[in-house]
C-alpha cells in the first residue's frame, strides 16, 4: 500500500508532466529544477513530508558566515520557514520546510517547493552581496539575478 507522500508524489509528477518520480530506499526523492536548484523530498512520516533545498557547501574561510547564517535562520523562523540546517554527509547548507500532508494537493506542494527555491535565491544573493559565497557548482550568481539584495524577504 502506498503512503500519502507516495500518492501525492505520483499526482505531482503527473501535474508537472514528468513520467514518474518516486522515493528511493532511503525515502528520499531528489530532482533539479532548471538544472540550478536541487530539491529533495523526504517521506518523513505519514503526517508530513520534508522539502529540502540544497544551497551549497559551507565556506570555511569566512569568519562572518556562522553569524550571518544564525541571523538568516532567525529571519526565516520569524516568517514561517524554511529553516537552515546542515547535512554532514555532503557538508552542505540546506533549507528545510515541513509540508503537512493533511489536505495536501500537487498545487500546494508545488507552491511550497517554490517557497524553498525563492528562499534559496534570496539567501544566496544576500550572502553573495556580503562577500560570502556558498560552494555550489549548479547555482551561479549570474543565473539567479543581478539583484542588489542586502536583506532577506519572505518567500511566501
Swiss-Prot record:
InterPro entries assigned: Tir_chaperone
Cellular compartment(s): Cytoplasm
Keywords: Chaperone, Cytoplasm, Virulence
Origin superkingdom: Bacteria
Disulfide bonds: none
GO biological process entries: protein secretion by the type III secretion system
A GO CC term assigned to this protein in UniProt: cytoplasm
Its job: Chaperone for the type III secretion of Tir. Probably stabilizes the protein, prevents inappropriate protein-proteininteractions and aids in secretion.
Family to which this protein belongs: Belongs to the CesT/SycH chaperone family.
Protein name per UniProt: Tir chaperone
Amino acid at each position: 500500500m502506498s503512503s500519502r507522500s507516495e500518492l501525492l508524489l505520483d499526482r505531482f509528477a503527473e501535474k508537472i508532466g514528468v513520467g514518474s518520480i518516486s522515493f528511493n530506499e532511503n525515502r528520499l526523492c531528489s530532482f533539479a529544477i532548471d538544472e540550478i536548484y536541487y530539491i529533495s523530498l523526504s517521506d518523513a512520516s505519514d503526517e508530513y513530508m520534508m522539502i529540502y533545498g540544497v544551497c551549497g557547501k559551507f565556506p570555511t574561510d569566512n569568519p562572518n558566515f556562522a553569524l550571518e547564517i544564525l541571523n538568516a535562520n532567525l529571519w526565516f523562523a520569524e516568517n514561517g520557514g524554511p529553516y537552515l540546517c546542515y547535512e554532514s554527509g555532503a557538508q552542505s547548507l540546506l533549507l528545510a520546510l515541513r509540508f503537512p500532508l493533511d489536505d495536501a494537493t500537487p498545487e500546494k506542494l508545488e507552491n511550497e517547493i517554490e517557497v524553498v527555491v525563492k528562499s534559496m535565491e534570496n539567501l544566496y544573493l544576500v550572502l553573495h552581496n556580503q562577500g560570502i559565497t556558498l560552494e555550489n557548482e549548479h547555482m551561479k550568481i549570474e543565473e539567479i539575478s543581478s539583484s542588489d539584495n542586502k536583506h532577506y524577504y519572505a518567500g511566501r
